[in-house]
Amino acid sequence: MSGKVDKKKGSSVKKTEGKSKEISALAAKIRAKALENQKKMLKNSETTSDQEDDPSESEEEEGSDSEDVEVSKDKQEEEEEGETFESFSDLDLVPELIEACKNLNFAKPTPIQARSIPPALQGHDIIGLAQTGSGKTAAFAIPILNRLWHDQQPYYACILAPTRELAQQIKETFDSLGSLMGVRSACIVGGMNMMDQARDLMRKPHIIIATPGRLMDHLENTRGFSLRKLKFLVMDEADRLLDMEFGPVLDRILKIIPTQGRTTYLFSATMTSKIDKLQRASLTNPVKCAVSNKYQTVDTLVQTLIVVPGGLKNTYLIYLMNEFIGKTIIVFTRTKANAERITTLANLLEFSATALHGDLNQNQRTGSLDLFKAGRRSILVATDVAARGLDIPSVDIVINYDIPVDSKSYIHRVGRTARAGRSGKSISLVSQYDLELILRIEDVLGKKLPKENVNKDAILTLRDSVDKANGEVVMELNRRNKEKIARGKGRRGRMAARDDMDKGER
């Protein structure tokens, strides 16, 4: 009997080794194609530099694009009337804040900061409307910290954010700007230990950054914690807070915290009827600071699309990963399953990828983001949980593997690149089923998206290799799912449901 078992084991080991060698060969084949393409690109760039006196057709097109950018910039500047400031020293800020801005290389206030900080410093409630990547976190953090310097007390300000990742990033901004002021902050989000968070709250932080569901849990259950003396309330990404059905929780929070002596800031990408209703219920005579009152993207973002034939989306994606080797890429998918599959496929083919989606626990999600931010992974494959608020400065490319179902999500996805004046590129993979969606997006943008230039012959040579690797991935993920089911993974109940709500994914 034991001999038979050993033979079977030996056979399965040989099969596994065979598959491993085969996949390694596929990865090497794909990498060789990438190297070949890079050499061609280098050759072309050398040829182009030799022909500087005789500009090519593509250079003429590039010049016309830059003219369009200048026109749109002029138009934007006409729309954005109001006072401009050459540096943060021009604002009435305490020296510690001005010094912190210098240390963070904040050269001068962005348009939303220039518009909202002066009235905020005068004590007004603020409605801030600005496109993603415009510097709105600092727009509310700076006036809060400036006032805190003169009136230090615990539980001074509470910032509500729709996702854990955004909450953590807001905390980092407050910690950086308040580094010379001894500011204490706490991040209170779902998916983390309630007792640890209760201990953080008992240390009496000045600034609390929270997702609404978890904040409500602590207001109801954590002894000694109260926001009765709260001076500032901020609702960041307010449109997203309402889209994620936090409305009832927000209503309960607004009833608990004081109205007298409280300053409220509401920041959103758009002004909708829901936002209008929320601001009427929570703000008093607010000053409206709008840098943009419609869906738009920044001028430094190049947006293109690729019409993908049926069954070739994986191949096109791997081709693009090859083309942009050395660049930082975020790939957006509509489902958690696709995010996990694409991450596994990319890693199997020896790319450097990590996933971000709602099936990961908080530590795993934080770990993924840290790997990507630190440059230890060049590709982040994410669902829309990551599309709002994530401030990763050096994202070069955004790829929409799945086209989002609404224009707002598209704007927020592509807003992960070309942030704070940097250039960036987004590429959307459009199947025959996505044509209606992309037409809607183009209608909102007010322009047609040009087609990305691709080498179709190079793509077709990758097809068999990618399909074979994807088949291996599907089998591996099915095996993992069976193991999870066998283990009876997952706790449920009231707290788990609340944590799911904070994740921002259904």
From Swiss-Prot:
Record region (Disordered): 1-22, 37-88, 485-506
Domain Helicase ATP-binding: 117-289
Residue sites binding ATP per the record: A130, Q131, T132, G133, S134, G135, K136, T137
Renumbered ranges of motif DEAD box: 236-239
SMART domains according to UniProt: DEXDc (SM00487), HELICc (SM00490)
Domain Helicase C-terminal as annotated: residue spans: 312-460
Short sequence motif Q motif: positions: 86-114
Compartments, as annotated in UniProt: Nucleus
Domain of life: Eukaryota
EC numbers for this chain: 3.6.4.13
Amino acid composition bias (Acidic residues), ranges on this chain: 49-69
UniProt keyword list: ATP-binding, Helicase, Hydrolase, Nucleotide-binding, Nucleus, Ribosome biogenesis, RNA-binding, rRNA processing
CDD domains the record matches: DEADc_DDX47, SF2_C_DEAD
Gene Ontology CC terms, in alphabetical order: cytosol; nucleolus; small-subunit processome
Biological-process GO terms, alphabetical: maturation of SSU-rRNA from tricistronic rRNA transcript (SSU-rRNA, 5.8S rRNA, LSU-rRNA)
Reaction it catalyzes: ATP + H2O = ADP + phosphate + H(+)
UniProt cross-references to Pfam families, sorted A to Z: DEAD, Helicase_C
Annotated InterPro entries: DDX47/Rrp3_DEADc (IPR044765), DEAD/DEAH_box_helicase_dom (IPR011545), DEAD_box_RNA_helicase (IPR050079), Helicase_ATP-bd (IPR014001), Helicase_C-like (IPR001650), P-loop_NTPase (IPR027417), RNA-helicase_DEAD-box_CS (IPR000629), RNA_helicase_DEAD_Q_motif (IPR014014)
Function text: ATP-dependent rRNA helicase required for pre-ribosomal RNA processing. Involved in the maturation of the 35S-pre-rRNA and to its cleavage to mature 18S rRNA.
Subunit structure: Interacts with the SSU processome.
Domain comment as written in the entry: The Q motif is unique to and characteristic of the DEAD box family of RNA helicases and controls ATP binding and hydrolysis.
Family: Belongs to the DEAD box helicase family. DDX47/RRP3 subfamily.
Protein name, as recorded: ATP-dependent rRNA helicase RRP3
Gene that encodes it: RRP3
